[in-house]
UniProtKB/Swiss-Prot annotation:
It is found in: Mitochondrion outer membrane. The lineage of its organism: Eukaryota, Viridiplantae, Streptophyta, Embryophyta, Tracheophyta. The gene is HXK2. GO terms for molecular function: ATP binding; D-glucose binding; fructokinase activity; glucokinase activity; hexokinase activity. This is Hexokinase-2. It comes from Arabidopsis thaliana. Highly expressed in siliques, at intermediate levels in roots and flowers, and at lower levels in stems, rosette and cauline leaves. One of its GO terms (biological process) is hexose metabolic process. Its EC number is 2.7.1.1.
């Protein structure tokens, strides 16, 4: 009996030791995997680093590319497009004007009543309409007929407040946020469609001409006074309310910048210098690239997998379209190489663009003790049923790295523009007031991003100069801005000037 007891005891001891060894091995394996997670995190943080010296290099490279793009067509990755807008709104504009804003799957028609310096925008009315999917890939005349049908019905609802003097033609500003080769203030040919549109017979056609032909088909008498993109609309809207606005930046799904340049500083401009001495330049800065940009393996793979490899490099690391996708790619590597979400990689994590930037922003903004929002988003988006607090903290760290890099590079770009136009220092000992008008959901709604961008710009400018540089949110520039540009370039301005002087 004693031998049986001893044997049983020995067997139990062996079993306990084996179980303990298994637990130890699992813990060691788990610790090894977690060490790999931290290793991936630290490497990513180092690759994304944006010390102030690097930001200055990026800003200097931006300035060099701006000079090159202004010198000749195709001389730079920055297109530096001449907009033909040489007269931004001053606030003195009066009358009522229309705007048409086409930049995606929705479009808007708008009318604004302007009351001059004191009354400003007296009244505005608008209608928004979705474009049926079949029109996004159909024929050019079908799309423009649909748009003009909505516009004509909107015109028919003018109330008594919107009174057109006898003999005057309605005037419209057309915001068209697709790549265009501008031919004049009110004409430009489509280079290519983006954002899900694919209408072959519009490419290389004057988009204003297509719009006017559609108007003529329904008997709508309206002059297209200005063709602009959303960034120039934002600049116009900002200048209308603040005469010190010199730069506009869109930070939304995509990104772009426009600014006021001295006309004599544009070597590729061969026309007569405008009376104002100024010209608005549409930079198309999303296409900026430089060896100084801190690019990672995830950025390179995202670029290779994109529809336009090698293009829009800056946009792919700072805009709302891509920030969430960068996060997904880092999490996927952690899941595959370090079992971050357990032994099985969540199938949803393999779907490109499943993590949208608004979701990333919501997680980044989570201040609850247990990071409840992060856990909820991981469950809702990736179907990760459980996540530990330390996992959630890693996700927060990744959000912070990605957003901080994007925000600081945006600030470097703005600083580069200010350097180009001599607004990065005091002039004759005096500070020049410079205002940057911002628009776009990324800047407006992702607080950590916008705050980081503003503080980084201040860091680059220094305390003294930053006192005279202001960053403001200029909502709805793409709508109101186009109407304001129609007003500031109205065909009736010279008649009004003549009547005032006579």
């Amino acid at each position: 009996m004693g031998k049986v007891a001893v044997a049983t005891t020995v067997v139990c001891s062996v079993a306990v030791c084996a179980a303990a060894a298994l637990i130890v091995r699992r813990r060691m394996k788990s610790a090894g995997k977690w060490a790999r997670v931290i290793e991936i995190l630290k490497a990513f943080e180092e690759d994304c680093a944006t010390p102030i010296a690097k930001l200055r290099q990026v800003a200097d490279a931006m300035t060099v590319e701006m000079h090159a793009g202004l010198a000749s067509e195709g001389g730079s990755k920055l297109k530096m497009l001449i907009s033909y807008v040489d007269n931004l709104p001053s606030g003195d504009e009066t009358g009522f004007f229309y705007a048409l804003d086409l930049g995606g799957t929705n479009f808007r028609v708008m009318r604004v009543l302007l009351g001059g310096k004191h009354d400003r925008v007296v009244k505005r009315e608008f209608k928004e309409e979705s474009i049926p999917p079949h029109l996004m890939t159909g024929k050019s005349h079908e799309l423009f007929d649909f748009i003009v049908d909505v516009l004509a019905k909107f015109v028919a609802t003018e109330g008594e407040d919107f009174h057109l003097p006898p003999g005057r033609q309605r005037e419209l500003g057309f915001t068209f946020s697709f790549p265009v080769k501008q031919l004049s203030l009110s004409s430009g040919t489509l280079i290519n469609w983006t954002k899900g549109f694919s209408i072959d017979d519009t490419v290389d056609k004057d988009v204003v001409g297509e719009l006017v032909k559609a108007m003529e088909r329904v008997g709508l008498d309206m002059l297209v006074a200005a063709l602009v993109n959303d960034t120039i609309g934002t600049l116009a809207g900002g200048r209308y309310t603040n005469p010190d606005v010199v730069v506009a930046v869109i930070l939304g799904t995509g990104t772009n910048a426009a600014y006021v340049e001295r006309a004599h500083a544009i070597p590729k401009w061969h026309g007569l210098l405008p009376k104002s001495g100024e010209m608005v330049i549409n930079m198309e800065w999303g296409n900026f690239r430089s060896s100084h940009l801190p690019l990672t393996e995830y950025d390179h793979s995202l670029d290779v997998d994109s529809l336009n490899p090698g293009e829009q490099i800056l946009e792919k690391i700072i805009s709302g379209m891509y920030l969430g996708e960068i996060l997904r790619r880092v999490l996927l590597k952690m899941a595959e190489e370090a079992a971050f979400f357990g032994d099985i990689v969540p199938p949803k994590l393999k779907i490109p663009f499943i993590i949208r930037t608004p979701n990333m922003s919501a997680m980044h903004s989570d201040t609850s003790p247990d990071l409840k929002v992060v856990g909820s988003k991981l469950k809702d988006i990736l179907e990760v049923q459980t996540s530990s607090l330390k996992m959630r903290k890693v996700v927060i760290s990744l959000c912070n790295i990605i957003a901080s890099r994007g925000a600081r590079l945006s600030a470097a770009g703005i600083y580069g523009i200010l350097k180009k136009i001599g607004r990065d220092a005091t002039k004759d000992g005096e500070a020049q007031k410079s205002v940057i008008a911002m628009d776009g959901g990324l800047f407006e709604h992702y607080t950590q991003f916008s705050e980081s961008m503003k503080s980084s710009l201040k860091e680059l400018l220094g305390d003294e100069v930053s006192e005279s540089v202001e960053v403001i949110l200029s909502n709805d520039g793409s709508g109101v801005g186009a109407a304001l540009l129609a007003a500031s370039h109205s065909q009736y301005l010279e008649l009004e000037d003549d009547s005032e002087t006579s």
